UniProtKB/Swiss-Prot annotation:
GO biological process: defense response to Gram-positive bacterium
Domain of life (superkingdom): Eukaryota
Name assigned to this protein: Dahlein-1.1
Known tissue expression: Expressed by the skin dorsal glands.
Location, primary (coarse class): secreted
Compartment(s) where it occurs, according to its Swiss-Prot or TrEMBL record: Secreted
Function per UniProt: Weak wide spectrum antimicrobial activity against Gram-positive bacteria.
Keyword Amino-acid biosynthesis assigned: no
Signal peptide as annotated in the record: none
Source species of the chain: Ranoidea dahlii
């Protein structure tokens, strides 16, 4: 979902 995308960006950091 949308949160998955946010968590994906945070994981990149």
């Amino acid at each position: 979902g949308l949160f998955d995308i946010i968590k994906n960006i945070v994981s990149t950091l």
